[in-house]
Amino acid sequence: MAPRKRNSRGVSFIFCCFRSSEHPEITYRLRNDSNFALQSMEPALPVPPVEELDAMFAELVDELDLSEKHREAMFALSAEKKWQIYCSKKKDHEEGATSWPEFYIDQLNSMAARRTLFAMDKEDEEERNKTIESLKTALRTKPMRFVTRFIDLDGLTCILNFLKSMDYEIAESQIHTSLIGCIKALMNNSQGRAHVLAHTESINVIAQSLATENIKTKVAVLEIMGAVCLVPGGHKKVLEAMLHYQRYASERTRFQTLINDLDRSTGRYRDEVSLKTAIMSFINAVLSQGAGVESLDFRLHLRYEFLMLGIQPVIDKLREHENSTLDRHLDFFEMLRNEDELEFAKRFDLVHIDTKSATQMFELIRKRLTHTESYPHFTSILHHCLQMPYKRSGNTVHYWLLLDRIVQQIVIQNEKGQDPDTSPLENFNVKNVVRMLVNENEVKQWKEQAEKMRKEHNELQQKLEKKERECDAKTQEKEEMMQTLNKMKEKLEKETTEYKNVKQQVAELTAQIQELNSRTVCAPGPGGPPPPPGAPGGPMSMPSGNFMPPPPPPPPPFPGGMAPPPPPPPPPPPPPGGPPPPPGLPLLGAAPPGAPLGLSMKKKNIPQPKNPLKSFNWSKLPDNKLEGTLWIDLDDAKVLKILDLEDIERTFSAYQRQQDFFVNNGIKQKEMDCTDDTLSSKMKVKELSVVDGRRAQNCNILLSRLKLTNEEIKRAILTMDEQEDLPKDMLEQLLKFVPEKSDIDLLEEHKHELDRMAKADRFLFEMSRINHYQQRLQSLYFKKKFAERVAEVKPKVEAIRDASKEVLQSKNLKQLLEVVLAFGNYMNKGQRGNAYGFKISSLNKIADTKSSIDKNITLLHYLITVVEKKYPKIVNLHEELQTISVAAKVNMTELEKEISALRNGLKSVENELEYQKTQPTLPGDKFVSVVSQFITVAGFSFCDVEDLLSEAKELFVKSAKRFGEETNKIQPDEFFGIFDQFLQAFLEAKQENENIRKRKEEEERRIRMEAQLKEQRERERKARKAKENGEEEGEFDDLVSALRSGEVFDKDLSKLKRNRKRIVSQTTESSRERPVTKLNY
């Protein structure tokens, strides 16, 4: 066979591509006898010694990753030929950057980013395709180091990303076919093939290319996937890829697209045999390789998918093409099918099983299982299948689909629990399920025990959380107390020092005054004799009266500027909601005082109801104010005789009737007539409720969420929630259900019926018995929220303080303002120019000035460019003003309101503490001790906040004046907001400048790469032309070629033909049943 020649640099398809227009050309073709036909060439350098040449040539052959047969052929060459090849390789190594993988990877990424051929001319498309073709040639012909380098740089991932990101136009172009060719060329190398198979999604992405209408691309994809089936570990990957393609292409079933393409016979598919051959070759590889080599069940399982898609009629139609290669694949499919069906039928002592007949298949199963332990389960399966829903709905189909997949899984899964096909049911291991069925009782016991342990765990978890809350609260209190103690120590030391200094100054001044007085006594004035000692107005009276030793220092002020505890106050005022009680007012529930002597009112004879009624909440007119009113002339006794008192009693009874259930039959008992007192007393539970219905309902909801008894709630309030039973949100809700004066009055009237009170009523009644219940609750809520509220306020004050310091101390800000001032004076003329300063709000107007060259460029963009060059430190201005953004969100008015609320709340708690000190201590009442400790700690914490606020205000005023702002007209949020807005605009403009710079660099890089590419294409023109004339195939190509021609199935096909003759002979003799060679599905 004549050798194929190339018109460019010498290329060996299986070895390497040696490109050089200067060196002599080598052309050869590998034959079966391993001889080469080489064109003579003159090496440019002298031939080295034989030993040195052999060592150099051995290094070259090792790089080519050749098989042993090909290595021997290479070493059989003469010394001159070896030297020629080595020189060409050396020249190839010295070529430019475009001959290295980095160049191709950059081009692939660039093309993938552009994604579309839209608005591109034909020349651009051809250039892109030439680049990919050049990569394909390099992967086939370059030394091993090129392929290794390409793999190390994630070249395969670049190709796959390009395949995934293609639009429709590229997918239907030659570029798509060339990309698949690159993968095929990469797999023609042992390392490349291993890398493709090891990649997590390579085969899936290759399978996605079946969606194209480009026939060449489809054929290339099918050839690759068919060959992968022949590679160890590749068969299952192909099946997974086809399942992936089913989801990708929204197929109803797997392999649907293949059968559709196989059946298409219109348009360009009418005489298209290559695609149909490739599909049949792929189907045969899927059926006969992988687990199908050994497992009959697996082959039957997979083939059934194709038969259900209607492949048999399509095969009959394909016979009309009369193509020998295609017929070879069709023969193999049918013979393998007949062989498998015969072997399967032997299991049931038959020649053929009609899998289209449900009756025959049922009978075979029934006969096989009769008189076995499995038969009851078989009948159970049939019985429950009869109970399956048969209505035409979406769920019905899915029930049968689930049953089908479970049976498939049982059939194809091997003994080790491994699935040769993609699992019909994920995470479904038949062996494990069987083991679980055997140990079902044991599993049930473990589940019960696990449930018990789970409940115990939850209970312990709740207890642990409760203890953790207690520990956290105690730890926080301890930390606050330690901080307060340290601050008190510092303050005491400071005041002690000041006191000593003042005392020393007073002593010095006293000594000076005494000295002056003594001098005055010794030298009397000329006005007459001095007055006698001790006389009024005499000089000696001053030291004795006015210069006594200084008194001891006063005690330290009370925390928070509060006065020391005053003497016990008078009795507490009444609860809110009513006027203060006048002197002599009887206690709650006692009889009212008698009428005044001037008007004696006779007690009315008013009928009494049998049961308590809801009260009419009126304001009673006192007897001493009745005289002279119309009330004297009214007689309600007449009206009472007319009214239906029983109906009133039924309608406004204080009892709430609740429906109950019969114990025996569980039927809900309807409300009975009130006249049947005997039956009513048995069927209904009476509850006394005088509280408003909606309020009582909301109170019940709150109590159910608390999950505490009234006694536990009472204990928590008295002990100031020592055990952390009352969360802050629950305390806030409890404050909404404080017993009011009207509620207390009504509840006191029925306190003798405590056991019959409704849940909400009893709760309100028992809470009303706590002295100052509302004030205690408010104090407890304030105590729990105090640290949180201080933690919310303090960062806001600190933000104003720190932001003021930052703008005062920032050198870069000062420098920036100086630069902006210079820009402004330069750009502005007339009255707007010649400025010594500007309002800081002008900073945010810099971006309003647009460039006259590019409207997207503003003065701010330009300013940043200048700053980066001339004042690089200013670029990091935001690092010096880190607190600005926080301070810009602080409203001073709202902040002062929050601090004032804290001050008032602290004062209220202090007042309640003073009141409780005057009251007798109840058992378990810890209000005084807990709150006293809290007031001490909270007072010092609040003093810190107030001092911090004063410092922040002072610094803000200083910073505002510093920038020429009027402090009475600008607030911190507005002042710092100006800087914050400017910094954001500054950083955004800086990023935009960076993006513009990157785009410019990318454009320059693209132009440079295109120039290199153009030069590379010119150098490789001859090499591409030689490639079009034909290429020697490598290992993977040999596999693809054998699969395409059907040679890979020749051995199996011959065996099947012999078996077929034997089967026909046996069938003729036995005449039991005619073998079926074709089944139409």
UniProtKB/Swiss-Prot annotation:
Q: Which GO terms describe its cellular component?
A: cell projection; cytoplasm; stress fiber
S-S bonds: none
What are the boundaries of the region Actin-binding? 696-705
Please list where the region (Disordered) is annotated: 455-476, 519-615, 1013-1038, 1060-1081
Boundaries of every FH2 domain copy: 603-1012
Q: Does the keyword Cytoplasm apply?
A: yes
Tell me where it resides.
Cytoplasm; Cytoplasm, Cytoskeleton, Cilium basal body
**Low complexity bias (residue ranges):** 538-547, 586-600
| One Pfam family this sequence matches | Drf_GBD
Where does the GBD/FH3 domain lie?
A: 45-418
Tell me which domain of life the UniProt entry assigns to the organism this sequence originates from.
Eukaryota
Domain DAD, by residue range, is 1030-1061
Q: What is its main location?
A: cytoplasm
List the keywords (alphabetical). Actin-binding, Cell projection, Cytoplasm, Cytoskeleton, Wnt signaling pathway
Note whether Cytoplasm occurs among the keywords.
yes
Any Gene Ontology biological process = Wnt signaling pathway
Q: Which InterPro entries match?
A: ARM-like, ARM-type_fold, DAD_dom, FH2_Formin, FH2_Formin_sf, FH3_dom, Formin_Homology, GBD/FH3_dom
Q: In UniProt terms, what function does this protein have?
A: Binds to disheveled (dsh) and Rho, and mediates Wnt-induced dsh-Rho complex formation during gastrulation. May play a role as a scaffolding protein to recruit Rho-GDP and Rho-GEF, thereby enhancing Rho-GTP formation. Can direct nucleation and elongation of new actin filaments. Involved in building functional cilia. Involved in building functional cilia. Involved in the organization of the subapical actin network in multiciliated epithelial cells.
**PANTHER family for this protein:** DISHEVELED-ASSOCIATED ACTIVATOR OF MORPHOGENESIS 1, FORMIN HOMOLOGY 2 FAMILY MEMBER
- What's the protein called, per UniProt? Disheveled-associated activator of morphogenesis 1-A
Q: Which gene encodes it?
A: daam1-a
